């Protein structure tokens, strides 16, 4: 399913959901950002998603004109299809420098040579046509080397595994966070590493004019749901905050 998140002038942001959906696999969203005659694919997914995503991208934009493949982190549902994207395009893959030497394990020998750009911990600006995407530090939310991608032109924060919702229709855009939290809380309490990290993130992103927060699983957030989510995340105990001796015992 194709969802148009933004379309103004030369700049478009498209979300693909339920590409190659399987009942025994987690639902994922993939993204295409186009600016003029070039574009970037964000979190292209695993092999389950590849065929449907490649065809979906091809209907919107010539894949050989992609200038970047962006990966928020190195989980298989993010980038396990990389071998096929390395064949189908000449674009480099941008990923945390922590994962730079892990990425070749997704591909046949030699396919990634000279095509992996390690994003430093502080982030970087990535040109896409006449625009840019900014890799924002999102480490330990949940991966050790993790980035979100801020598109100032559309006002969209592509948030990776933060703001995820489970068991929902991903094509629904949420503006009222309250009823939606039941689909978010368990995931965030387990997958996010600590409240300290969430507070640091909240302080960073509050300074941005965010129109939408769009995660890699589940529904996009817009309008009042954006500041409400930032406030909620800032106050959430999660990850190591919830762990104690009872969680580290020999099984019975």
Name each model feature, range by range.
Residues 5, 95-224, 234-236:
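Metallo-beta-lactamase
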Residues 49, 74-79, 100-103, 124, ...:
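Active-site environment of divalent metal-dependent phosphoester hydrolases
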Residues 49-94:
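Active-site metal-binding motif and surrounding structural segment of the metallo-beta-lactamase
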Residues 2-58, 147-151, 155-160:
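Conserved beta-strand hairpin/beta-sheet module of binuclear metal-dependent hydrolase folds
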Residues 217-252:
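Binuclear metal-ion centers of metallo-dependent hydrolases, dominated by the metallo-beta-lactamase
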Residues 9, 88-89, 112:
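Short, structured coil segments at secondary-structure junctions
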Residues 42-44, 65-74, 93-97, 157-161, ...:
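Active-site neighborhood of phospho(di)ester-bond hydrolases with catalytic His/Asp-centered motifs
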